[in-house]
Protein backbone atom coordinates (compact mmCIF):
# COMPACT_ATOMS: atom_id res chain seq x y z
CA UNK A 1 0.00 0.00 0.00
CA UNK A 2 2.80 2.40 0.88
CA UNK A 3 4.47 1.72 -2.48
CA UNK A 4 1.25 2.64 -4.27
CA UNK A 5 0.92 5.84 -2.25
CA UNK A 6 4.54 6.81 -2.89
CA UNK A 7 4.22 6.23 -6.63
CA UNK A 8 0.99 8.22 -6.71
CA UNK A 9 2.60 11.08 -4.82
CA UNK A 10 5.57 11.05 -7.21
CA UNK A 11 3.24 11.40 -10.19
CA UNK A 12 1.05 14.13 -8.69
CA UNK A 13 3.56 15.97 -6.55
CA UNK A 14 1.27 15.49 -3.54
CA UNK A 15 2.03 13.93 -0.19
CA UNK A 16 1.16 10.20 0.11
CA UNK A 17 -1.78 11.12 2.37
CA UNK A 18 -3.12 13.68 -0.12
CA UNK A 19 -2.72 11.23 -2.99
CA UNK A 20 -4.67 8.53 -1.13
CA UNK A 21 -7.30 11.08 -0.15
CA UNK A 22 -7.77 12.06 -3.79
CA UNK A 23 -8.57 8.47 -4.78
CA UNK A 24 -11.49 7.96 -2.37
CA UNK A 25 -14.79 9.72 -1.75
CA UNK A 26 -15.36 11.54 1.52
CA UNK A 27 -17.88 9.11 2.95
CA UNK A 28 -17.13 10.21 6.52
CA UNK A 29 -19.47 13.19 6.13
CA UNK A 30 -22.17 10.92 4.67
CA UNK A 31 -21.70 8.50 7.57
CA UNK A 32 -21.98 11.28 10.16
CA UNK A 33 -25.17 12.74 8.71
CA UNK A 34 -26.70 9.28 8.18
CA UNK A 35 -26.20 8.27 11.81
CA UNK A 36 -27.41 11.69 12.96
CA UNK A 37 -30.54 11.29 10.82
CA UNK A 38 -31.43 8.04 12.57
CA UNK A 39 -30.73 9.49 16.04
CA UNK A 40 -32.79 12.63 15.41
CA UNK A 41 -35.51 10.54 13.80
CA UNK A 42 -35.94 8.64 17.06
CA UNK A 43 -35.87 11.86 19.11
CA UNK A 44 -38.36 13.73 16.91
CA UNK A 45 -40.83 10.84 16.90
CA UNK A 46 -40.49 10.42 20.67
CA UNK A 47 -41.44 14.08 21.19
CA UNK A 48 -44.28 13.65 18.70
CA UNK A 49 -45.69 10.64 20.56
CA UNK A 50 -45.43 12.52 23.86
CA UNK A 51 -47.38 15.56 22.64
CA UNK A 52 -49.94 13.27 20.96
CA UNK A 53 -50.38 11.70 24.41
CA UNK A 54 -50.82 15.20 25.86
CA UNK A 55 -53.69 15.81 23.43
CA UNK A 56 -55.31 12.64 24.77
CA UNK A 57 -54.33 13.02 28.43
CA UNK A 58 -53.71 16.74 29.18
CA UNK A 59 -52.41 15.85 32.65
CA UNK A 60 -49.13 14.91 30.95
CA UNK A 61 -48.29 18.62 30.79
CA UNK A 62 -47.52 18.14 34.52
CA UNK A 63 -48.01 21.89 35.04
CA UNK A 64 -44.42 22.42 33.86
CA UNK A 65 -44.11 25.24 31.27
CA UNK A 66 -41.27 23.66 29.28
CA UNK A 67 -43.23 20.41 28.95
CA UNK A 68 -46.38 22.12 27.69
CA UNK A 69 -47.79 21.28 24.26
CA UNK A 70 -47.27 24.83 23.00
CA UNK A 71 -43.51 24.59 23.55
CA UNK A 72 -42.94 20.97 22.59
CA UNK A 73 -44.96 21.07 19.36
CA UNK A 74 -42.49 23.41 17.57
CA UNK A 75 -39.65 21.28 18.95
CA UNK A 76 -41.27 18.23 17.35
CA UNK A 77 -41.76 19.92 13.97
CA UNK A 78 -38.26 21.39 13.90
CA UNK A 79 -36.71 18.06 14.92
CA UNK A 80 -38.69 16.08 12.35
CA UNK A 81 -38.10 18.51 9.48
CA UNK A 82 -34.68 20.07 10.05
CA UNK A 83 -32.96 17.43 12.20
CA UNK A 84 -34.27 14.13 10.81
CA UNK A 85 -35.21 15.38 7.34
CA UNK A 86 -32.27 17.78 7.07
CA UNK A 87 -29.62 15.23 8.04
CA UNK A 88 -31.16 12.74 5.59
CA UNK A 89 -30.92 15.32 2.80
CA UNK A 90 -27.34 16.26 3.65
CA UNK A 91 -26.20 12.64 3.84
CA UNK A 92 -27.78 11.66 0.54
CA UNK A 93 -26.73 14.84 -1.29
CA UNK A 94 -23.08 14.37 -0.30
CA UNK A 95 -23.26 10.74 -1.45
CA UNK A 96 -25.00 11.56 -4.74
CA UNK A 97 -22.95 14.61 -5.75
CA UNK A 98 -19.64 12.80 -5.29
CA UNK A 99 -20.69 9.71 -7.23
CA UNK A 100 -22.47 11.46 -10.09
CA UNK A 101 -19.56 13.91 -10.45
CA UNK A 102 -16.97 11.16 -9.78
CA UNK A 103 -14.87 13.39 -7.58
CA UNK A 104 -14.31 13.98 -3.87
CA UNK A 105 -16.11 16.94 -2.31
CA UNK A 106 -14.24 20.19 -2.79
CA UNK A 107 -13.58 20.84 0.92
CA UNK A 108 -13.53 18.36 3.80
CA UNK A 109 -13.17 21.14 6.36
CA UNK A 110 -16.23 23.06 5.14
CA UNK A 111 -18.23 19.83 5.12
CA UNK A 112 -17.15 19.14 8.71
CA UNK A 113 -18.14 22.69 9.67
CA UNK A 114 -21.51 22.07 8.02
CA UNK A 115 -22.07 18.91 10.06
CA UNK A 116 -21.08 20.31 13.45
CA UNK A 117 -22.74 23.67 12.76
CA UNK A 118 -26.02 21.94 11.95
CA UNK A 119 -25.86 19.78 15.07
CA UNK A 120 -25.30 22.96 17.09
CA UNK A 121 -28.41 24.49 15.47
CA UNK A 122 -30.43 21.41 16.46
CA UNK A 123 -29.17 21.48 20.05
CA UNK A 124 -29.85 25.23 20.30
CA UNK A 125 -33.41 24.59 19.12
CA UNK A 126 -33.81 21.73 21.61
CA UNK A 127 -32.85 24.10 24.44
CA UNK A 128 -34.44 27.39 23.38
CA UNK A 129 -37.89 26.19 22.24
CA UNK A 130 -38.88 24.43 25.51
CA UNK A 131 -37.67 27.52 27.38
CA UNK A 132 -40.18 29.59 25.42
CA UNK A 133 -37.84 31.50 23.11
CA UNK A 134 -39.71 31.71 19.81
CA UNK A 135 -40.54 34.11 16.99
CA UNK A 136 -43.99 32.56 16.76
CA UNK A 137 -43.66 31.72 13.06
CA UNK A 138 -44.29 28.14 11.98
CA UNK A 139 -41.11 26.36 10.83
CA UNK A 140 -39.23 29.62 11.57
CA UNK A 141 -39.51 29.79 15.36
CA UNK A 142 -35.80 29.99 16.12
CA UNK A 143 -34.53 33.35 17.35
CA UNK A 144 -32.06 35.53 15.48
CA UNK A 145 -28.73 34.20 16.87
CA UNK A 146 -29.70 30.69 15.78
CA UNK A 147 -31.00 32.02 12.45
CA UNK A 148 -27.59 33.54 11.76
CA UNK A 149 -25.89 30.22 12.53
CA UNK A 150 -28.31 28.50 10.13
CA UNK A 151 -27.42 30.98 7.38
CA UNK A 152 -23.65 30.60 7.88
CA UNK A 153 -23.90 26.81 7.97
CA UNK A 154 -26.08 26.84 4.85
CA UNK A 155 -23.55 28.93 2.94
CA UNK A 156 -20.84 26.39 3.82
CA UNK A 157 -23.09 23.59 2.53
CA UNK A 158 -23.79 25.47 -0.71
CA UNK A 159 -20.09 26.12 -1.31
CA UNK A 160 -19.25 22.43 -0.85
CA UNK A 161 -22.13 21.18 -3.01
CA UNK A 162 -21.80 23.59 -5.93
CA UNK A 163 -18.01 23.62 -5.66
CA UNK A 164 -18.01 19.84 -6.07
CA UNK A 165 -20.21 20.15 -9.17
CA UNK A 166 -17.75 22.75 -10.46
CA UNK A 167 -14.84 20.28 -10.34
CA UNK A 168 -16.83 17.30 -11.65
CA UNK A 169 -15.14 14.84 -14.00
CA UNK A 170 -18.41 14.02 -15.78
CA UNK A 171 -19.72 16.68 -18.17
CA UNK A 172 -23.40 15.94 -17.55
CA UNK A 173 -25.04 17.10 -14.31
CA UNK A 174 -27.37 14.30 -13.24
CA UNK A 175 -30.97 15.37 -12.55
CA UNK A 176 -30.84 14.47 -8.84
CA UNK A 177 -28.26 17.23 -8.42
CA UNK A 178 -30.66 19.69 -10.07
CA UNK A 179 -33.23 19.01 -7.37
CA UNK A 180 -30.63 19.22 -4.59
CA UNK A 181 -29.31 22.47 -6.07
CA UNK A 182 -32.78 24.02 -6.26
CA UNK A 183 -33.44 22.98 -2.67
CA UNK A 184 -30.21 24.65 -1.50
CA UNK A 185 -30.76 27.92 -3.39
CA UNK A 186 -34.47 28.25 -2.58
CA UNK A 187 -34.10 27.51 1.14
CA UNK A 188 -31.31 30.10 1.39
CA UNK A 189 -33.55 32.72 -0.24
CA UNK A 190 -36.56 31.82 1.89
CA UNK A 191 -34.61 31.81 5.14
CA UNK A 192 -32.86 35.13 4.55
CA UNK A 193 -36.08 36.98 3.62
CA UNK A 194 -38.29 35.52 6.35
CA UNK A 195 -35.61 35.79 9.05
CA UNK A 196 -35.20 39.54 8.54
CA UNK A 197 -35.75 40.89 12.05
CA UNK A 198 -34.87 43.74 14.39
CA UNK A 199 -33.12 42.29 17.49
CA UNK A 200 -34.50 43.50 20.81
CA UNK A 201 -32.26 41.40 23.02
CA UNK A 202 -30.09 38.32 22.86
CA UNK A 203 -33.14 36.05 22.42
CA UNK A 204 -35.84 38.48 21.33
CA UNK A 205 -36.59 40.12 17.99
CA UNK A 206 -39.36 41.68 15.93
CA UNK A 207 -40.08 41.03 12.26
CA UNK A 208 -39.24 43.85 9.85
CA UNK A 209 -42.61 43.18 8.21
CA UNK A 210 -45.98 44.03 9.73
CA UNK A 211 -49.61 43.04 9.44
CA UNK A 212 -50.78 41.15 6.39
CA UNK A 213 -47.39 41.58 4.70
CA UNK A 214 -45.77 39.71 7.58
CA UNK A 215 -48.33 36.91 7.20
CA UNK A 216 -47.74 36.72 3.45
CA UNK A 217 -43.95 36.56 3.81
CA UNK A 218 -44.33 33.90 6.51
CA UNK A 219 -46.50 31.64 4.35
CA UNK A 220 -44.46 32.30 1.24
CA UNK A 221 -41.66 30.88 3.39
CA UNK A 222 -43.77 28.20 5.08
CA UNK A 223 -45.26 26.78 1.90
CA UNK A 224 -41.95 26.81 0.06
CA UNK A 225 -40.14 25.25 3.00
CA UNK A 226 -42.49 22.36 2.26
CA UNK A 227 -41.96 22.81 -1.48
CA UNK A 228 -38.19 22.89 -1.52
CA UNK A 229 -36.97 21.43 1.78
CA UNK A 230 -39.55 18.64 2.02
CA UNK A 231 -40.20 18.10 -1.69
CA UNK A 232 -37.45 19.14 -4.11
CA UNK A 233 -34.63 17.85 -1.92
CA UNK A 234 -36.30 14.49 -1.39
CA UNK A 235 -37.05 14.18 -5.10
CA UNK A 236 -33.27 14.22 -5.48
CA UNK A 237 -33.28 11.07 -3.32
CA UNK A 238 -35.96 9.54 -5.56
CA UNK A 239 -34.05 10.11 -8.80
CA UNK A 240 -30.86 8.49 -7.50
CA UNK A 241 -31.77 5.85 -4.94
CA UNK A 242 -34.84 4.26 -6.54
CA UNK A 243 -32.99 3.50 -9.82
CA UNK A 244 -30.03 2.19 -7.80
CA UNK A 245 -32.12 -0.05 -5.54
CA UNK A 246 -34.31 -1.26 -8.42
CA UNK A 247 -31.28 -1.65 -10.71
CA UNK A 248 -33.25 0.09 -13.47
CA UNK A 249 -32.71 3.46 -15.20
CA UNK A 250 -35.11 6.33 -14.55
CA UNK A 251 -38.31 5.61 -16.51
CA UNK A 252 -38.12 8.87 -18.47
CA UNK A 253 -35.15 11.17 -18.10
CA UNK A 254 -36.89 13.74 -20.31
CA UNK A 255 -39.89 13.73 -17.98
CA UNK A 256 -37.56 14.27 -15.01
CA UNK A 257 -36.27 17.48 -16.63
CA UNK A 258 -39.81 18.70 -17.41
CA UNK A 259 -40.80 17.73 -13.86
CA UNK A 260 -37.95 19.81 -12.44
CA UNK A 261 -38.66 23.05 -14.31
CA UNK A 262 -42.44 22.84 -13.91
CA UNK A 263 -42.12 22.24 -10.17
CA UNK A 264 -39.53 24.98 -9.65
CA UNK A 265 -41.56 27.59 -11.52
CA UNK A 266 -44.92 26.76 -9.96
CA UNK A 267 -44.19 26.11 -6.28
CA UNK A 268 -43.08 29.63 -5.36
CA UNK A 269 -46.51 31.10 -6.17
CA UNK A 270 -48.75 28.81 -4.12
CA UNK A 271 -48.15 30.15 -0.58
CA UNK A 272 -51.31 32.32 -0.32
CA UNK A 273 -53.53 29.23 -0.13
CA UNK A 274 -52.50 29.01 3.55
CA UNK A 275 -54.25 32.33 4.16
CA UNK A 276 -57.72 31.76 2.68
CA UNK A 277 -60.48 33.70 4.44
CA UNK A 278 -58.03 36.12 6.10
CA UNK A 279 -57.17 39.80 5.57
CA UNK A 280 -54.97 38.85 2.60
CA UNK A 281 -56.32 40.48 -0.61
CA UNK A 282 -58.76 38.18 -2.37
CA UNK A 283 -56.86 38.28 -5.68
CA UNK A 284 -53.74 37.02 -3.89
CA UNK A 285 -55.68 34.16 -2.34
CA UNK A 286 -57.08 33.26 -5.77
CA UNK A 287 -53.61 33.40 -7.34
CA UNK A 288 -52.32 30.98 -4.73
CA UNK A 289 -55.26 28.66 -5.39
CA UNK A 290 -54.68 28.63 -9.17
CA UNK A 291 -50.98 27.84 -8.88
CA UNK A 292 -51.75 25.16 -6.29
CA UNK A 293 -54.05 23.46 -8.79
CA UNK A 294 -51.39 23.72 -11.51
CA UNK A 295 -48.93 22.05 -9.12
CA UNK A 296 -50.84 18.79 -9.40
CA UNK A 297 -49.44 18.15 -12.90
CA UNK A 298 -45.68 18.31 -12.19
CA UNK A 299 -46.11 16.61 -8.81
CA UNK A 300 -47.90 13.62 -10.26
CA UNK A 301 -45.56 13.58 -13.25
CA UNK A 302 -42.65 13.06 -10.86
CA UNK A 303 -44.53 10.47 -8.85
CA UNK A 304 -45.41 8.46 -11.97
CA UNK A 305 -41.83 8.74 -13.23
CA UNK A 306 -40.52 7.31 -9.96
CA UNK A 307 -43.03 4.47 -9.75
CA UNK A 308 -42.66 3.51 -13.44
CA UNK A 309 -38.90 3.19 -12.93
CA UNK A 310 -39.83 -0.26 -11.62
CA UNK A 311 -41.12 -1.28 -15.06
CA UNK A 312 -39.92 -4.81 -15.63
CA UNK A 313 -38.93 -5.17 -11.98
CA UNK A 314 -42.27 -5.16 -10.15
CA UNK A 315 -41.46 -8.56 -8.66
CA UNK A 316 -38.73 -6.92 -6.57
CA UNK A 317 -41.37 -5.32 -4.36
CA UNK A 318 -42.21 -8.77 -2.99
CA UNK A 319 -38.71 -9.45 -1.74
CA UNK A 320 -37.09 -6.04 -1.22
CA UNK A 321 -38.45 -4.12 1.80
CA UNK A 322 -36.07 -1.20 1.11
CA UNK A 323 -37.56 -0.70 -2.35
CA UNK A 324 -41.00 -1.04 -0.79
CA UNK A 325 -40.22 1.88 1.56
CA UNK A 326 -39.30 4.01 -1.45
CA UNK A 327 -42.31 3.16 -3.60
CA UNK A 328 -44.80 3.55 -0.75
CA UNK A 329 -43.14 6.92 -0.05
CA UNK A 330 -43.98 7.94 -3.63
CA UNK A 331 -47.55 6.76 -3.06
CA UNK A 332 -47.85 9.07 -0.05
CA UNK A 333 -46.27 11.83 -2.15
CA UNK A 334 -49.02 11.30 -4.72
CA UNK A 335 -51.72 11.39 -2.05
CA UNK A 336 -50.32 14.54 -0.41
CA UNK A 337 -49.86 16.36 -3.73
CA UNK A 338 -53.43 15.58 -4.76
CA UNK A 339 -54.84 16.54 -1.38
CA UNK A 340 -52.90 19.83 -1.19
CA UNK A 341 -54.30 21.34 -4.41
CA UNK A 342 -57.77 20.07 -3.49
CA UNK A 343 -57.56 21.75 -0.07
CA UNK A 344 -56.47 25.00 -1.75
CA UNK A 345 -59.87 25.29 -3.48
CA UNK A 346 -61.76 27.88 -1.45
CA UNK A 347 -64.93 25.80 -1.16
CA UNK A 348 -63.01 22.81 0.21
CA UNK A 349 -60.82 25.05 2.35
CA UNK A 350 -63.89 26.53 4.02
CA UNK A 351 -64.43 23.06 5.49
CA UNK A 352 -60.81 22.06 6.17
CA UNK A 353 -59.40 25.37 7.46
CA UNK A 354 -58.23 25.21 11.10
CA UNK A 355 -59.31 21.56 11.47
CA UNK A 356 -57.35 18.36 12.09
CA UNK A 357 -57.66 17.58 8.37
CA UNK A 358 -54.57 19.78 8.02
CA UNK A 359 -52.78 17.59 10.58
CA UNK A 360 -53.63 14.50 8.52
CA UNK A 361 -52.34 16.20 5.38
CA UNK A 362 -48.98 17.31 6.76
CA UNK A 363 -48.31 14.00 8.49
CA UNK A 364 -49.12 12.05 5.35
CA UNK A 365 -46.46 14.16 3.65
CA UNK A 366 -43.92 14.14 6.48
CA UNK A 367 -44.23 10.61 7.89
CA UNK A 368 -45.30 8.90 4.68
CA UNK A 369 -43.34 10.74 2.00
CA UNK A 370 -40.34 12.29 3.77
CA UNK A 371 -40.02 9.62 6.46
CA UNK A 372 -40.29 6.58 4.19
CA UNK A 373 -38.01 7.86 1.41
CA UNK A 374 -35.43 8.86 4.06
CA UNK A 375 -35.62 5.44 5.72
CA UNK A 376 -35.25 3.69 2.38
CA UNK A 377 -32.20 5.81 1.54
CA UNK A 378 -30.64 5.20 4.97
CA UNK A 379 -31.16 1.44 4.61
CA UNK A 380 -29.35 1.70 1.27
CA UNK A 381 -26.47 3.80 2.63
CA UNK A 382 -25.71 2.38 6.08
CA UNK A 383 -24.33 -1.04 5.03
CA UNK A 384 -22.20 0.53 2.30
CA UNK A 385 -20.83 3.13 4.71
CA UNK A 386 -19.73 0.41 7.15
CA UNK A 387 -18.34 -2.10 4.66
CA UNK A 388 -21.31 -4.46 4.78
CA UNK A 389 -23.21 -6.05 1.89
CA UNK A 390 -26.61 -5.58 3.53
CA UNK A 391 -28.29 -4.48 6.75
CA UNK A 392 -27.91 -6.73 9.79
CA UNK A 393 -31.53 -7.92 9.56
CA UNK A 394 -33.76 -7.74 6.48
CA UNK A 395 -36.53 -9.22 8.62
CA UNK A 396 -36.30 -6.20 10.93
CA UNK A 397 -36.66 -3.90 7.89
CA UNK A 398 -39.76 -5.87 6.89
CA UNK A 399 -41.24 -5.51 10.38
CA UNK A 400 -40.34 -1.81 10.45
CA UNK A 401 -42.12 -1.29 7.12
CA UNK A 402 -45.39 -2.88 8.21
CA UNK A 403 -45.42 -1.36 11.71
CA UNK A 404 -44.76 2.14 10.33
CA UNK A 405 -47.27 1.76 7.50
CA UNK A 406 -50.04 0.62 9.84
CA UNK A 407 -49.13 3.48 12.19
CA UNK A 408 -49.42 6.07 9.41
CA UNK A 409 -52.77 4.70 8.24
CA UNK A 410 -54.18 4.85 11.78
CA UNK A 411 -52.83 8.38 12.25
CA UNK A 412 -54.01 9.85 8.96
CA UNK A 413 -57.41 8.14 8.92
CA UNK A 414 -58.17 9.32 12.46
CA UNK A 415 -57.23 12.91 11.67
CA UNK A 416 -59.08 12.93 8.34
CA UNK A 417 -62.30 11.80 10.00
CA UNK A 418 -61.79 14.17 12.95
CA UNK A 419 -61.07 17.10 10.63
CA UNK A 420 -64.15 16.65 8.45
CA UNK A 421 -66.28 16.15 11.56
CA UNK A 422 -64.91 19.35 13.13
CA UNK A 423 -65.53 21.36 9.96
CA UNK A 424 -69.12 20.14 9.70
CA UNK A 425 -69.82 20.77 13.41
CA UNK A 426 -68.39 24.31 13.31
CA UNK A 427 -70.45 25.34 10.30
CA UNK A 428 -73.70 23.74 11.54
CA UNK A 429 -76.28 26.47 12.28
CA UNK A 430 -79.74 26.37 13.89
CA UNK A 431 -82.76 27.95 12.14
CA UNK A 432 -82.40 31.03 14.35
CA UNK A 433 -78.79 31.53 13.20
CA UNK A 434 -77.09 30.31 16.38
CA UNK A 435 -74.39 27.64 16.34
CA UNK A 436 -75.67 24.08 16.72
CA UNK A 437 -72.56 22.96 18.61
CA UNK A 438 -70.25 24.76 20.99
CA UNK A 439 -66.51 24.55 20.38
CA UNK A 440 -66.12 22.41 23.51
CA UNK A 441 -68.59 19.89 22.09
CA UNK A 442 -66.44 19.53 18.98
CA UNK A 443 -63.37 18.96 21.15
CA UNK A 444 -65.21 16.27 23.13
CA UNK A 445 -66.29 14.54 19.91
CA UNK A 446 -62.69 14.56 18.67
CA UNK A 447 -61.26 12.82 21.74
CA UNK A 448 -61.56 9.18 20.47
CA UNK A 449 -59.71 10.14 17.29
CA UNK A 450 -56.87 11.65 19.33
CA UNK A 451 -56.50 8.28 21.04
CA UNK A 452 -56.26 6.52 17.66
CA UNK A 453 -53.77 9.18 16.52
CA UNK A 454 -51.62 8.46 19.57
CA UNK A 455 -51.65 4.72 18.84
CA UNK A 456 -50.67 5.34 15.22
CA UNK A 457 -47.82 7.63 16.23
CA UNK A 458 -46.65 5.10 18.81
CA UNK A 459 -46.44 2.40 16.11
CA UNK A 460 -44.41 4.73 13.89
CA UNK A 461 -42.05 5.47 16.80
CA UNK A 462 -41.62 1.74 17.47
CA UNK A 463 -40.63 1.39 13.83
CA UNK A 464 -37.93 4.02 14.32
CA UNK A 465 -36.59 2.10 17.33
CA UNK A 466 -36.40 -1.07 15.22
CA UNK A 467 -34.47 0.88 12.60
CA UNK A 468 -32.08 2.31 15.20
CA UNK A 469 -31.35 -1.21 16.53
CA UNK A 470 -30.72 -2.48 13.00
CA UNK A 471 -28.37 0.42 12.24
CA UNK A 472 -26.39 -0.13 15.45
CA UNK A 473 -26.02 -3.85 14.74
CA UNK A 474 -24.92 -3.18 11.15
CA UNK A 475 -22.41 -0.51 12.16
CA UNK A 476 -20.86 -2.53 14.97
CA UNK A 477 -20.50 -5.61 12.73
CA UNK A 478 -18.50 -3.62 10.18
CA UNK A 479 -16.11 -0.71 10.11
CA UNK A 480 -16.18 2.71 8.45
CA UNK A 481 -15.01 2.62 4.83
CA UNK A 482 -14.58 5.24 2.11
CA UNK A 483 -15.32 4.05 -1.42
CA UNK A 484 -12.64 4.33 -4.11
CA UNK A 485 -13.32 6.80 -6.92
CA UNK A 486 -13.59 4.78 -10.17
CA UNK A 487 -11.16 5.62 -12.94
CA UNK A 488 -13.72 5.16 -15.73
CA UNK A 489 -16.02 8.12 -16.30
CA UNK A 490 -19.49 6.62 -15.90
CA UNK A 491 -22.34 7.47 -13.55
CA UNK A 492 -22.07 5.69 -10.19
Regions from the PLM with identified roles:
Residues 63, 135-138, 278-281, 349-353:
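Membrane-interface helix termini and inter-helical loops of multi-pass transporters
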Residues 14-21, 442-446:
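Short, charged/polar, low-complexity loop and linker segments
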Residues 1-12:
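N-terminal acidic, proline/glycine-rich, low-complexity intrinsically disordered segments
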Residues 208-217, 352, 357-359:
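Active-site-proximal inter-transmembrane loops
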Residues 2-3, 31-133, 144-165, 177-202, ...:
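Hydrophobic cores of alpha-helical transmembrane segments in multi-pass integral membrane proteins
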Amino acid sequence: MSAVLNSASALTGQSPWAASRATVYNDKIVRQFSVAAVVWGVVSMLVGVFIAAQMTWPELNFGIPWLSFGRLRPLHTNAAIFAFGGCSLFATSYWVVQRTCQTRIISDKLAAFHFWGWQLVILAAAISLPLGYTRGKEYAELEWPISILIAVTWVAYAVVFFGTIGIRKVRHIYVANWFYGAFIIAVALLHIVNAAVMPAGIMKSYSVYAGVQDAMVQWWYGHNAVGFFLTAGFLGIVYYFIPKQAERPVYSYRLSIVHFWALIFTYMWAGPHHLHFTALPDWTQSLGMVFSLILLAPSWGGMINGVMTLSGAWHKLRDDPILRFMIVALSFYGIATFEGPMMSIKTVNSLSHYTDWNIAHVHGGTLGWVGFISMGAMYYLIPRLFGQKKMHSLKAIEIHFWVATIGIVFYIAAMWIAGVMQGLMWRSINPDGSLTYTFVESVKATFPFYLVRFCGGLLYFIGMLIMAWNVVMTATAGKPVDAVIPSNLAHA
